[in-house]
Amino acid sequence: MLEGQIRESISKSQAKALRNDGYLIANIYGKGQQNIHCAFKLNDFIKAMKQKTTLIFPVQVGGKTLEVVIQEYQKDPVTNTLIHVDLLLAQKGILNKYKVPVIVKGNAKGLKNKGVLFISTKRISVKCAAENLPNAYEIDVSDLDVGDSILIRDLPQFDNVNVLNRPSVAVVGVIKAK
């Protein structure tokens, strides 16, 4: 389980000192809950994210175990390392907005016809309760030829999950190489 420490001060200088010591600055928030300013060891956080199998994962901060989902993250533009992450509390029975990743499976037949697979939407915005949150949208692209695409309306529908993206938005497609 990922363990973090509560930050006493939220000043810029203290955040910079924590980053220099190898910590990742984080905020945990939820509806009707007090915001928690905390920090995690950067390497431990990255290991935990690679090992998790669901979008919702537990963290321990200040002696409490919380179920959270990554809402946003920021990377350093030069070094490409994580510098900040926002974690949303996964509260049962409360509707929240989440971003669900898209996982592409298979090889498109359009790739043999000088096409290029183009993933235009990497995360789908949904509104649902935490217990109904899908782990990912898995899309099989084996039948896509040059000029074909899969739209939001073509994705599988989950019970009690409302997709917030427009139905006409392309998720993945095969475009002709120049």
From Swiss-Prot:
Domain of life of the organism in this record? Bacteria
UniProt-listed GO biological process terms = translation
Which InterPro entries does this UniProt record tie to the protein? Answer: Rbsml_bL25/Gln-tRNA_synth_N, Ribosomal_bL25/Gln-tRNA_synth, Ribosomal_bL25_b-dom, Ribosomal_bL25_C, Ribosomal_bL25_long, Ribosomal_L25_dom, Ribosomal_uL5_bac-type
Task: Establish whether keyword RNA-binding is in the entry.
Answer: yes
User: Does the keyword field hold Ubl conjugation?
Assistant: no
Q: Which Pfam families match?
A: Ribosomal_L25p, Ribosomal_TL5_C
SUPFAM superfamilies, alphabetized: Ribosomal protein L25-like
Gene3D superfamilies recorded: Ribosomal protein L25, beta domain (2.170.120.20), Ribosomal Protein L25, Chain P (2.40.240.10)
Q: Name one GO molecular function term.
A: structural constituent of ribosome
**A GO cellular-component term linked to this record:** cytosolic large ribosomal subunit
User: What's the family?
Assistant: Belongs to the bacterial ribosomal protein bL25 family. CTC subfamily.
Per its UniProt record, what PANTHER family does this chain match? RIBOSOMAL PROTEIN L25/GLN-TRNA SYNTHETASE, ANTI-CODON-BINDING DOMAIN-CONTAINING PROTEIN, RIBOSOMAL PROTEIN L25_GLN-TRNA SYNTHETASE, ANTI-CODON-BINDING DOMAIN-CONTAINING PROTEIN
User: What does the UniProt record say this protein does?
Assistant: This is one of the proteins that binds to the 5S RNA in the ribosome where it forms part of the central protuberance.
Q: How does it assemble?
A: Part of the 50S ribosomal subunit; part of the 5S rRNA/L5/L18/L25 subcomplex. Contacts the 5S rRNA. Binds to the 5S rRNA independently of L5 and L18.
Q: Name the chain's protein.
A: Large ribosomal subunit protein bL25
